[in-house]
Swiss-Prot record:
It comes from Enterobacter sp. (strain 638). PANTHER family: FORMAMIDOPYRIMIDINE-DNA GLYCOSYLASE. GO terms for molecular function: 8-oxo-7,8-dihydroguanine DNA N-glycosylase activity; class I DNA-(apurinic or apyrimidinic site) endonuclease activity; damaged DNA binding; zinc ion binding. A zinc finger (FPG-type) spans 235-269. This is Formamidopyrimidine-DNA glycosylase.
Length: 269
């Protein structure tokens, strides 16, 4: 599933081609996504794009009279293409632009979403989200306070969007390794110093992944069709049985809330 770095990479890739251009019309080939494509998107016509923003894993296209909310789901991607390039089987939505480009949404598993809203504030998919991990609001004091009475393992708690947005399975595993914290540790057991370290490494890991264009494991591609390269730097995720790059101990895989977790028994306590 695309996580925050992949969505931010997509945002940065499509923004220069959309802002300042006008959506001439939309082509919805298959509107049966996680939720049905909003009716307003089917009928888009002559709408200039004012900005391309991101909140958590949602891309937000600002138009004069409302917002398009896009979620990439499990396998979705956005590409900027020339208008004449024919659509393929899993190309479900196009925005045809005035500059001769097309924003094409591809989603083999159809778990993504294309929604419309007049106002972002209070929309049900955005209303209960925690702070952005790269913002000043996500700091050691905040994390310590939110962990203080939490009797659940730290790994799934980091992946809870009510705590902090966009830290999915890959980056939770990588951040806990970088912080030296075992994923089975109860959130309430983290010290102030550990919270400070964890916040710093989460920010560093996410920023590094954004610089590398995200992590390509199976489905994710950047808006230009190229893969993300952070997968080449993964320390634990997807490396079950391989030697830890720090100490040589074989990487262990386990399950948390039905999600694979990877860690080093020696380096993480």
């Amino acid at each position: 599933m695309p996580e925050l770095p992949e969505v931010e990479t997509s945002r940065r890739g499509i923004e220069p081609h959309l802002v300042g251009a006008t959506i001439l019309h939309a082509v919805v080939r298959n509107g049966r996504l996680r939720w049905p494509v909003s009716n307003e998107i089917h009928t888009l016509s002559d709408k200039p794009v004012l900005s391309v923003q991101r909140r958590a894993k949602y891309l937000l296209l600002e138009l004069p009279d409302g917002w398009i909310i896009i979620h990439l789901g499990m396998s979705g991607s956005l590409r900027i293409l020339s208008e004449e390039l024919p659509a393929e089987k899993h190309d479900h939505v196009d925005l045809v632009m005035s500059n001769g480009k097309v924003l094409r949404y591809t989603d083999p598993r159809r778990f993504g979403a294309w929604l419309w809203t007049k106002e972002l504030e209070g929309h049900n998919v955005l209303a209960h989200l925690g702070p952005e991990p790269l913002s000043e609001a996500f700091n050691a004091e905040y994390l310590k306070a939110r962990c203080a009475k939490k009797k659940t393992p730290i790994k799934p708690w980091l992946m809870d969007n009510k705590l902090v947005v966009g830290v999915g399975n890959i980056y939770a595993s990588e951040s806990l390794f970088a912080a030296g914290i075992h994923p089975d540790r109860l959130a309430s057991s983290l010290s102030e110093q550990e919270c400070e370290i964890l916040v710093k490494v989460i920010k560093a890991v996410l920023l590094r992944s954004i610089e590398q264009g995200g992590t390509t494991l199976k489905d994710f591609l950047q808006s230009d069709g190229k893969p993300g390269y952070f997968a080449q730097e993964l320390q634990v995720y997807g490396r079950k049985g391989e030697p830890c790059r720090v100490c040589g101990t074989p990487i262990v895989a386990s399950k948390h809330a039905q999600r694979a977790t990877f860690y080093c028994r020696q380096c993480q306590k």
